[in-house]
Structures are given as C-alpha cells and as structure tokens.
C-alpha cells in the first residue's frame, strides 16, 4: 500500500514473531490485510535482531558496527515512513490528528533506537556513563514496543483511507442508481448509465484490490460473491431499465427492474460490511453452523475425552450431537432424497446417538478404574463413534452430490428456458403459465440442493459459494418469469426479448458454476484440492512442433461457442458421475480407481477449457492432453482386463464387452493427436470433446460394473468360507 516505508514480504503471522523476542505491542491493533502485515515484517525482523543479541558476550568491533547499522537502518526507514504518513495526513483532514500523533511517536522511538545502538565509541562507555543497548536492553525493548505500535497505528489509519475510498465510491454508485431508477427518457438514461458504468469500473478496481489484500478467506469469499452480483447485475440493470422505459405501464417489467436494483443494493451493502468489518444493525448471520463444522467440533471434544484434557458434560456433548442431527433432518425431510439414502442416514444417526451414550458411560467408568483395560475400552469407543460420524458425513456427502449431479444432468439442455423464450415470442400466456410453473419447480429443487451442499461443502469459502448459488437461483428464477411475462405481453419487443436472454444467460451461467462447485466440494472431501490438473505437469512432448501456435485462429461464432459450452457442461457432469462412482470404492489405491480418477480430473480440465478457463491454452497443450488421456484410457482397460481374470466366465464376458468399446475410442483419440489442429479448429475441438465424452460415459459404466462385480466376488468368497466353516463344524 502507499504508506509502506519498507519493502514488503513475509506471510501471515509475521508481526507476532516479535513476541518471541520478549516484547509486544498494542494487541488491540488487529491487522486484517496482507499489505499492512508485509510492510511491518522487515521492521519486525530488524528489531528482533537487536533484541536477540546476547547480553553477556564480548562484542567485537564488527558486531558492534553491525548493531549500529541495524539501528540506523531502522531510524532511516521510520523517517521515510513518517514522511509518507504525514503526506497521507495532509490529504485526509479527518484522520490528520491521529496520524500525526502516531508519526511523532514513531519518529521518537526510531531516534531512541538509533541512539541506544550507537555503541561504536567503546572508549567512552565507562568514562561518561553513556546508556547504550549494552547497558540498557530494557530501554530498547520499550522503544521497540512503542515503534511497532505507532507504525502499526499509522498503517491502519492509512488503511482506513482505502476503506473510505471504497465507501465513497459505493455512495456515488447508490446516488447514481437512484437517478437511474427515476429516469423517464432514453436519452437521459443513456447519459446517466454511462456515468454509472464508469463508477462501477472504479468500484470494481477498488474492491478487487481489497479482496486480494484480505487475510481472512471467509471475507475474501464474501467479497468475491458480492462483486460477482454487481458485475452480472450491471448488464441486467441495463436491459431491465430499457424494457421499463419502452413499456412503462407493464407491471412485470417494473417488478423485474426492482428485483435487479434491490439485489445490487444488497451487494453494495455487503461490500461495506466487509471492508468496515461491522454488521449492519438488526442483521444476523444468514447461515447456521453446517453439518460438516458441527461434526468436526464434536469430534474435537470427543478426542479431548481420550486425552483426558477436559470433560464436556454429558448434556453438552449430547446437545452438540443433537444440533448436528437436527440439520441432518434437512436431508431426511427432503422430497428429493432417495429412500435408500434416507434409510441409511437415519440408521447412522441412531447409531451415533447410541455410541455417544456408550462413550460417556465408558469414560465415567475409566475415571474410577484407571486400568489398562479400561483405557483400551475407552479408546475403542472413541474410535467407534468417530467412525460412525465419518460414515454419516460420507453418506450425507454422497446424497447431496448425487442429487446435485442428477439435477444438473437433467436440466443440462435448459428445455424450460428455451420454451419460455418461444412462448414469449408467440405471446402465448397459457403456455407461459405452464412453463413458469416448471421453472419454479426447478428453482425449488436447485435451492434445496444448494442448502444441502452447504452442509457438506467442507470449507467456509465453499459454504459461502453455496449460499450465493442458492440466493442466485431464488432471485434469478423469479426475474426470468417476470421477464418472460413482459415478452409474452409484448411479443414483438426486441428489448423485452434481449432482457429475457440476459436473465436466462445468468441462470445458465449459475448452473455451470454449480458444476464447478461440485468438483471443488469433491476435491475438498477427498483431500485432493488443487490436484485437478496434475497431468499437465508431465514432460511435454517435443513432436508436432508445427502446432505450437495458439488456438486463436478461426474464432468460433456464437452458435459454435454455445455448442462447445454445452458439450463441455455434459463433460463436467460426467466427471462428477465418475467421482461419485469412485467414492464407493474402499481401496483408493486400486489400479482401476487410480486410472479412473485421473481420467475424471482430465475430463474436468477439458470442461474448464470449454469455458475459457484452466491451464489448457494452446494447441500444444491440447495435443499433449489428448495423448495423456488416451494413454490413461488404455491403462484403465489393461487394469480392468487383469481384474476380469478373477471373475467367472459370464461376468468376465460382460466386462470384456465393455472394455472392447473403450479401446477403439482410445486409439481413435491417439490418431487425432497426429493431425494438425491449426486448421478448422472448431470442428476438431468439437470432435475431440465428443470423443472424450463418449469415453467418459464408458468409464462411468466400467467403474460401476467393476465395483458391483468386485462386491459380488467378495460376497461369494465370504459365503464359501462360511459354508466351509459350517461343514467343518459338522464333521
């Protein structure tokens, strides 16, 4: 930030390293941004060097000179810092007095440290009684504490200037929005909207910088969500306002417009809340503790029993479990949860209750017996309930993920949105009512699914993303219906049609974002977050050097882009399906599982490519990707063939038939990599994605079939062993 007097560096918690040196500063000065923390780090490092010198060792001239250089460096850095602080004070009269006081304190502390470290005149130390770092280390500690405290105050006051800029920018936008809301002519609207656009750009830059600077990941996620609403809302505000101006007496057009303005105002207030770190009066947290967090905290308290660190009362532990199980009812009460999942969840919930009571009973007995056997029994009961809670969490995860994946797959073609567009242009009010009802049903399904996903998301930022998705589906669903109603009432209106298109695109975009969210939740659950594109770190082949150009030539038109996006979404859904199948396997190191997981991750990378995201950028990247994917497919077929040798003839034949479908597709994909992608790029990319989609469909089927056959084989072995034991017993 502008107020930094010394180079930045370091990471979180750097400031607190000073405590180890025996000094602290004002604990009320909470540091919330990386820039402030990193600005302080070099100063902390220099002061720590001074404080940590050994008191009773003889100092060489070289050591004394080094101490003096550090002291002078600190004083010079503080001097530069004070000049910057004073300049900021002169530009911000409301903070001038506070900044100047802190600058004076910092300057005095810097001069004190410079004086105390002036120890090169060793011959005068004893004769004139000069006080130095060698004779008054306490004075240095006090000066260091004052210096860090005053410098931190200046930095935080300067940070308030940044906050003030964001709030001022927000206020300008709100004022312009009020003018936009009241405008009555197109000409006036265009002029004001141009100003609004410039203000939004400035606000986006300020909030983007702030988002990157925040230390708290939860706040960063909330800021990202609010900024996304504002970014997408700007286009919605434009088309909704134009529609209102064109059809001023249309009630649905006004409803549509009001929805956009309301949501943007809420997003602006959320930004203010985040940067000022205060919740608006009367506002409460929109979310309760998720099931994932509840189980995590409960397990920590249970582990404390094992270590005998503390004893949570029976009532407290039972209440904590009941709070978790109360949220579990969101799953069991949902009309979209399958009977099989519901029964399993209820069974695991009952099991957790029983095992907690058993644990509490065993713990009480352990306190009186204090024997090895009692300790072992306690250990066993702790392991049992921990396992039950993990199983419950896994079942909830599978339930929510499967529901979400099925829902995205079912609505991948956006049939209802297309029907609403057609009925609008036709002016068919009866059909509008029918499809509006269908969209409302779809919206309710998606909203409930997002609520369930929040419970199992695994991190606070992902929880916030789930809440955002829920709110977006809730609001956008209503706005699509009002926009469709406006078009149906005015079927020849180009502006009304454009407005409906914008809201439908926002819905489709959120559906696509939800597919990404599923993958991120899955990554967190399996502990493989950030490994999505690990195959791209493999050595890149040097052949096909003629294809090193970017994939920019022959830019596809909007229809081609839409087709690619649709194929990509289906590929993303297949990747989620594969993950769901993989989750069923207990042996994560199984060769079939390993190759299936690799192919799933790579398919997801290609899905990101269709959105213009991810690491796949050039034809070289894509060729390498296709080669690795085809090779991974052949490795999977090889592993499945090895597994088939353990099966009976009928099962073996069934599995080999599926393998024989996948092998030719792998070879065809290898053939594609040997041809240039530079000409007719769209057609070849389309062909590649279609081929990989077919392969992933077979991979999902193979994973499912192999799992079923594996379980069948294990059950047969267990049955044979049981029969043998029975026969042996009879003999």
From Swiss-Prot:
May modulate the Rho pathway signaling by providing a scaffold for the Lbc Rho guanine nucleotide exchange factor (ARHGEF1). It is a peripheral membrane protein. The keyword Translocase does not apply. Its main location: cytoplasm. The modification Phosphoserine is found at residues 373, 537. It comes from the Eukaryota. This is Alpha-catulin. GO terms for biological process: cell adhesion; Rho protein signal transduction. The keyword RNA-binding does not apply. The gene is Ctnnal1. Keywords: Cell membrane, Cytoplasm, Cytoskeleton, Membrane, Phosphoprotein. InterPro entries: Alpha-catenin/vinculin-like_sf, Alpha_catenin, CTNNAL1, Vinculin/catenin. It is found in: Cytoplasm, Cytoskeleton; Cell membrane. It holds the Pfam family Vinculin. GO terms for molecular function: actin filament binding; cadherin binding. Residues 535-559 are annotated as: Disordered. Interacts with ARHGEF1. Interacts with Dtna. The interaction is required for correct localization of both Ctnnal1 and Dtna. Belongs to the vinculin/alpha-catenin family.
